[in-house]
Amino acid sequence: MENIKLAVIGLGYVGLPLARLFATRYPVVGYDVKRERVAALMEGRDATQEVSDELLRSVLLPRLPEEGEAGLFCTSDAEQLRGCNYYIVAVPTPVDLHHSPDLTPLYSASETVGKVLGRGDIVIYESTVCPGITEDECVPLSLIHI
């Protein structure tokens, strides 16, 4: 597997540890809509402690990774995802009082990926969804701009 550049969409309790681990071997761009969270992560601080500050700092890059350069760069600018060829969507799918999932974050992430997706790129949905949601709703949103 050569020329891998990963994007992890959603830097929460699933996305951040995943991004950190992949960044030990591959170039990774971590994306989150929460600018304050991204700023803290880029300073090497994870308030949730999903990843220790020491482990986080060990993989952080001050800029987008170059081809073949292992490390993690975090951003809230979706344009900086352009050039990645593997996208892992790890956004929350919270449920309401009636136990119905709120798929808004998933739809938004699918649209974000779709704007930078290239032919042959791979999208992996890590978020928990009901059967059929990925194929019927997320994929069409991702492909709308190709």
Regions found by a protein language model. Name each.
Residues L41, L56, T134-S142:
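Hydrophobic packing residues within well-ordered alpha-helices of enzyme cores
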Residues L64-Y125, C130-I133:
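Rossmann-like NAD(P)-binding element
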